[in-house]
A protein has these predicted regions:
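Hydrophobic alpha-helical transmembrane segments
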Residues: 1-171, 175, 183-318
């Protein structure tokens, strides 16, 4: 428990350092290196899938073993040394401060009426085209990103830490990074990235639904509409193209009385994603801040729940 709380506090105070030695940056470099080595456009679909699966296995093994080795050697440190090493590594696997900082920055620009710069900033955190987005569309994109990334950027790493300590949290982050880099359904990655995408879907199965429940409790604690959040999650979560992505987004949409989803543009091509929630309010800057509050509340609730469950089970905490 000390490790998880310390990791959260390290992130809250320091945030993610912008360094080429950041573990997730190193994972990205390894993935890019292996992609260059394994991907061949002329390969058959079956071979592309096999080579992509090999990339996944290698990245997972290296990431897990590196974290396990660091934790093994940290046990020789005096006092709280091992817990602090674990907390530092775990803090690199979660990103509440980065999400909050990005959201607050976009919110501030919208309040100033600076749509041009807000479009630029939101373009850093979403994959869609942003050059023609309205204020409501910028706010929608930001809320969707914060909600979805609460799963893979906070709750899921902490969930896998609870199960298997720091090495398993690192393994999850490696899997999620592979999905974000090669898990696309386009011509290049449809087969090569399929193993990465399927693995990410499987790993997020429980954390995504857990995040939805945490958001409902958070909505109740913060005075938002928890009942509507539950109803919208049950009604709309399965409409998301991802098997997991809809739970956090639908719950936030219900709690804040907004509608997410709709028309997005990718590389100049419009794509419609099913609506989630009801447009009781027009999505705006205040909903970004409310979503950030829900994100932090859900994180604290998870840490409290983590403590209670492990105490009841009689296990020592990581």
């Amino acid at each position: 428990m000390l490790t998880a709380i310390s990791a959260f506090l390290i992130d809250a105070i320091i945030g993610d350092p912008n360094s080429k030695w950041h573990p997730v940056v190193l994972m990205g470099k390894l993935i890019s290196f292996l992609e260059r080595a394994f991907y061949r456009p002329e390969d058959s679909d079956g071979k592309k899938f096999a080579m992509g699966a090999m990339l996944v296995i290698i990245v997972l093994l290296i990431s897990y073993d590196a974290a396990a080795a660091l934790m093994h050697f940290s046990y020789y440190l005096p006092g709280w040394g091992s817990a602090m090493v674990g907390a530092l590594i775990l803090s690199f696997m979660i990103s509440p401060k980065s999400l909050a900082k990005a959201g607050k920055g976009i919110c501030a620009l919208l309040l100033l009426g600076n749509l041009e710069e807000a479009r630029q900033k939101v373009g850093w955190i979403v994959g869609r085209d942003t050059d023609k987005l309205s204020e409501a569309e910028i706010a929608r994109a930001t809320v969707e990103t914060i909600a979805e990334n609460t799963v893979d950027g906070i709750i899921a790493p902490l969930f896998f830490f609870a199960i298997g300590g720091v090495p398993l949290a690192v393994l999850y982050r490696a899997a999620n990074t592979m999905d974000s880099m090669i898990g696309y359904k386009n011509e290049k990655y449809l087969y090569f990235g399929r193993a990465a995408a399927r693995l990410d879907d499987a790993l997020n199965l429980i954390p995504a639904r857990l995040t939805g429940l945490l958001f409902i409790v958070s909505a109740w604690l913060l005075g938002f509409d928890a009942r509507h959040a539950l109803n919208i999650m049950k009604r709309d979560a399965d409409k998301h193209p991802s098997p997991n992505g809809g739970y956090a987004e639908a719950t936030v949409a219900g709690a804040l009385h907004i509608r997410l989803g709709g028309v997005n543009s990718y590389f100049g091509r419009e794509s419609f994603r099913a609506y989630m929630g009801d447009p009781i309010q027009v999505t705006g800057p205040k909903h970004i801040m409310e979503c950030i509050r829900m994100m932090y509340t859900a994180t604290v609730l998870y840490l409290i729940g983590f403590y209670i469950v492990f105490q009841c089970l009689g296990h020592s905490l990581y």
